[in-house]
């Protein structure tokens, strides 16, 4: 027991460093894309392929990663993903042509997606119920810290001739440190040595030796046996509502709102984005501290309700403020991306430019549209939807206009914080708890693939949705979706706070319909307490 604090610290480092690598790789392309375009003369389509190749690799990993995690174990999957990431970073750092860049990005995307699934499962199985929420949520904290770290590094290396090579190479550092931590930890809950290894950490939560474990196939996820269908409904519902509430798109308009309230110029916009990222890190830290105290359901309900109010507020402000949007994509652009992955954070990813360059727009997104336009030598547009706020504002309503813009900024800050408290960290924590160990990797990967697919769908449909119903109604639609998500969480998502994985397993096996989860949870805890008191 004397080694327990050290082991818990190693578990925390695995979760935090895994998230840091994930967040850094998501954000690094925002600072590297412009120098890559200048060095390789990338066209608009080539830039979109370069940005989207990471998403493609991540989607591939979500399709096959579950089988790798269940067959070879969680720790081996993480170590293997780190090896792929190191290879991808090396390819990117030494790349001399677009195909090598695409191969490197594809490899990195595969690695971070596989690692994100394996890390959450590995840590959730390795520690007891009292530490599980905090340690798994540290992965989300790592993502936000990694993105902030990429902001600073991109800003420092923006003027360096080969700065983009160093940007890609720095991702190897947290991956190497995580691998070192893994070598000092047990293999995990699977394998013959697992009960002996986990005794110091989980105590009575470990499986009894000699107990015959059930075998599950992938199709069992859709059957009623052992409550598997209920688990699948809960898992898919959480990942889909995480995306359908508009998280991949809301922050595409962040830089325009920043400019509207006075953040003019490249450096000011970068600092404003860092401020937004700092708010997100703070909210994630709050969620990490509360997840084992307040519970998973409470954070999900609170976060989703706050998201519904804040995104609806952005929509209402959009009715009052004249905002125009239009897709544009030039070969020379200040491109940035915002991608929300497992355990994803939804943080604005913003690139910093050398002082001599000027941009009319600061935000971009993954593949949205390609317009056939001639390449202009001056950077005048950005990837993705851009809000035109350059129209003159009459002198008389200037105060009202300023208040509305600040209201939109506050709503966006609240939205980011609400996501970081609820869907951001808790979704992947719940997914790592509700499935049996024998199929946990495949189930987690199955839900993760829907998360990536929904992210891509929301991103690709954003411009068409705005063209059909307008910007304000688009945000109000996201608010309505958040209300539906609130009802889903209240009715179907169980509370897993303070329960061992075995107790969560029993809860699903004995409940035929998820609507009974809240009542059954209270009864289960009551009997557990009576049993403990009588035993003492």
Swiss-Prot record:
<comment type="similarity">
    <text>Belongs to the major facilitator superfamily. Sugar transporter (TC 2.A.1.1) family. Glucose transporter subfamily.</text>
</comment>
<feature type="transmembrane region" description="Helical; Name=6">
    <location>
        <begin position="167"/>
        <end position="187"/>
    </location>
</feature>
<keyword id="KW-0812">Transmembrane</keyword>
<feature type="topological domain" description="Cytoplasmic">
    <location>
        <begin position="70"/>
        <end position="82"/>
    </location>
</feature>
<dbReference type="GO" id="GO:0005886">
    <property type="term" value="C:plasma membrane"/>
</dbReference>
<feature type="transmembrane region" description="Helical; Name=11">
    <location>
        <begin position="443"/>
        <end position="463"/>
    </location>
</feature>
<feature type="transmembrane region" description="Helical; Name=9">
    <location>
        <begin position="299"/>
        <end position="319"/>
    </location>
</feature>
<dbReference type="InterPro" id="IPR003663">
    <property type="entry name" value="Sugar/inositol_transpt"/>
</dbReference>
<feature type="topological domain" description="Extracellular">
    <location>
        <begin position="464"/>
        <end position="468"/>
    </location>
</feature>
<feature type="transmembrane region" description="Helical; Name=8">
    <location>
        <begin position="270"/>
        <end position="290"/>
    </location>
</feature>
<dbReference type="GO" id="GO:1903053">
    <property type="term" value="P:regulation of extracellular matrix organization"/>
</dbReference>
<keyword id="KW-0762">Sugar transport</keyword>
<feature type="topological domain" description="Cytoplasmic">
    <location>
        <begin position="1"/>
        <end position="15"/>
    </location>
</feature>
<dbReference type="GO" id="GO:1902729">
    <property type="term" value="P:negative regulation of proteoglycan biosynthetic process"/>
</dbReference>
<feature type="binding site">
    <location>
        <position position="428"/>
    </location>
    <ligand>
        <name>D-glucose</name>
    </ligand>
</feature>
<feature type="topological domain" description="Cytoplasmic">
    <location>
        <begin position="424"/>
        <end position="442"/>
    </location>
</feature>
<feature type="topological domain" description="Cytoplasmic">
    <location>
        <begin position="291"/>
        <end position="298"/>
    </location>
</feature>
<dbReference type="GO" id="GO:1902730">
    <property type="term" value="P:positive regulation of proteoglycan biosynthetic process"/>
</dbReference>
<feature type="topological domain" description="Extracellular">
    <location>
        <begin position="320"/>
        <end position="402"/>
    </location>
</feature>
<dbReference type="InterPro" id="IPR050820">
    <property type="entry name" value="MFS_Sugar_Transporter"/>
</dbReference>
<dbReference type="InterPro" id="IPR005828">
    <property type="entry name" value="MFS_sugar_transport-like"/>
</dbReference>
<dbReference type="GO" id="GO:0048471">
    <property type="term" value="C:perinuclear region of cytoplasm"/>
</dbReference>
<dbReference type="GO" id="GO:0012505">
    <property type="term" value="C:endomembrane system"/>
</dbReference>
<keyword id="KW-0813">Transport</keyword>
<feature type="transmembrane region" description="Helical; Name=12">
    <location>
        <begin position="469"/>
        <end position="489"/>
    </location>
</feature>
<feature type="transmembrane region" description="Helical; Name=1">
    <location>
        <begin position="16"/>
        <end position="36"/>
    </location>
</feature>
<feature type="transmembrane region" description="Helical; Name=4">
    <location>
        <begin position="108"/>
        <end position="128"/>
    </location>
</feature>
<dbReference type="GO" id="GO:0030511">
    <property type="term" value="P:positive regulation of transforming growth factor beta receptor signaling pathway"/>
</dbReference>
<dbReference type="InterPro" id="IPR020846">
    <property type="entry name" value="MFS_dom"/>
</dbReference>
<dbReference type="GO" id="GO:0060840">
    <property type="term" value="P:artery development"/>
</dbReference>
<feature type="topological domain" description="Extracellular">
    <location>
        <begin position="154"/>
        <end position="166"/>
    </location>
</feature>
<dbReference type="GO" id="GO:0045454">
    <property type="term" value="P:cell redox homeostasis"/>
</dbReference>
<feature type="topological domain" description="Extracellular">
    <location>
        <begin position="254"/>
        <end position="269"/>
    </location>
</feature>
<feature type="transmembrane region" description="Helical; Name=7">
    <location>
        <begin position="233"/>
        <end position="253"/>
    </location>
</feature>
<feature type="transmembrane region" description="Helical; Name=2">
    <location>
        <begin position="49"/>
        <end position="69"/>
    </location>
</feature>
<keyword id="KW-0963">Cytoplasm</keyword>
<keyword id="KW-0472">Membrane</keyword>
<feature type="topological domain" description="Extracellular">
    <location>
        <begin position="37"/>
        <end position="48"/>
    </location>
</feature>
<keyword id="KW-1133">Transmembrane helix</keyword>
<dbReference type="GO" id="GO:0030512">
    <property type="term" value="P:negative regulation of transforming growth factor beta receptor signaling pathway"/>
</dbReference>
<feature type="topological domain" description="Cytoplasmic">
    <location>
        <begin position="129"/>
        <end position="132"/>
    </location>
</feature>
<dbReference type="GO" id="GO:0072498">
    <property type="term" value="P:embryonic skeletal joint development"/>
</dbReference>
């Amino acid at each position: 027991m004397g080694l327990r604090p050290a082991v818990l610290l190693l578990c925390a480092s695995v979760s935090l460093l895994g998230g840091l690598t994930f967040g850094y790789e998501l954000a690094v392309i925002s600072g590297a894309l412009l120098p890559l375009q200048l060095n390789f003369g990338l066209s608009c389509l080539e830039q979109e392929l370069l940005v989207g190749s990471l998403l493609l690799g991540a989607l591939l990993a979500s399709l096959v990663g579950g089988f790798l995690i269940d067959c070879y174990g969680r720790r081996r999957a993480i170590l293997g993903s780190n090896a792929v990431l190191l290879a991808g970073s090396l390819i990117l750092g030494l790349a001399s042509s677009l195909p090598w860049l695409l191969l490197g990005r594809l490899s990195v995307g595969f690695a971070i997606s596989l690692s994100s699934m394996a890390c959450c499962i590995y840590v959730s199985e390795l520690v007891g119920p009292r530490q599980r929420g905090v340690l798994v949520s540290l992965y989300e904290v790592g993502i936000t810290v990694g993105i902030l770290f990429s902001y600073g590094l991109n800003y420092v290396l923006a003027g360096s001739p080969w700065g983009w090579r160093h940007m890609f190479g720095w991702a190897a550092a947290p991956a190497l440190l995580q691998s070192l931590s893994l070598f000092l930890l047990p293999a995990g809950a699977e394998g013959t040595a697992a009960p002996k290894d986990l005794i110091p950490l989980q105590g009575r939560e470990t499986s009894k030796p000699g107990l015959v474990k059930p075998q599950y196939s992938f199709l069992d996820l859709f059957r009623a046996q052992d409550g598997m269908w209920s688990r699948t409904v809960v898992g898919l519902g959480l990942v889909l509502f995480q995306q359908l509430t508009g998280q991949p798109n809301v922050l595409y308009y962040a830089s325009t709102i920043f400019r509207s309230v006075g953040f003019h110029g490249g450096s000011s916009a970068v600092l404003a984005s860092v401020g937004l990222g700092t708010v997100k890190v703070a909210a994630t830290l709050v969620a990490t501290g509360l997840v084992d105290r307040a519970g998973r359901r409470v954070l999900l309900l609170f976060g989703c309700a706050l998201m519904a109010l804040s995104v609806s507020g952005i929509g209402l402000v959009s009715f009052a403020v004249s905002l125009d949007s239009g897709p544009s994509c030039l070969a020379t652009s200040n491109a940035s991306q915002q991608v929300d992955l497992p355990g994803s954070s939804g943080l604005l990813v913003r690139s910093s430019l050398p002082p001599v360059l000027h941009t009319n727009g600061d935000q971009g997104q993954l593949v949205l549209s390609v317009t056939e336009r001639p390449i202009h030598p001056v950077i005048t547009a950005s990837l993705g939807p851009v809000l035109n706020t350059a129209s003159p504002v009459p002198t008389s309503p200037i105060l009202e206009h300023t208040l509305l813009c600040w209201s939109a900024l506050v709503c966006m800050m609240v939205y980011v914080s609400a996501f970081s408290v609820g869907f951001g960290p808790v979704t992947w924590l719940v997914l790592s708890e509700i499935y049996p160990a024998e199929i946990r990797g495949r189930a987690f990967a199955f839900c993760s693939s829907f998360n990536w697919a929904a992210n891509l769908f929301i991103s690709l449909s954003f411009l068409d949705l705005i063209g059909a119903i307008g910007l304000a109604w688009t945000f109000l639609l996201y608010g309505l979706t958040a209300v539906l998500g609130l009802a889903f969480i209240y009715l179907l998502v169980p509370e897993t706070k303070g329960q061992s994985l075995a107790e969560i397993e029993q809860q699903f096996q004995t409940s035929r319909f998820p609507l009974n989860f809240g009542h059954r949870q209270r009864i289960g805890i009551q009997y557990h307490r009576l049993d403990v008191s009588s035993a003492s």
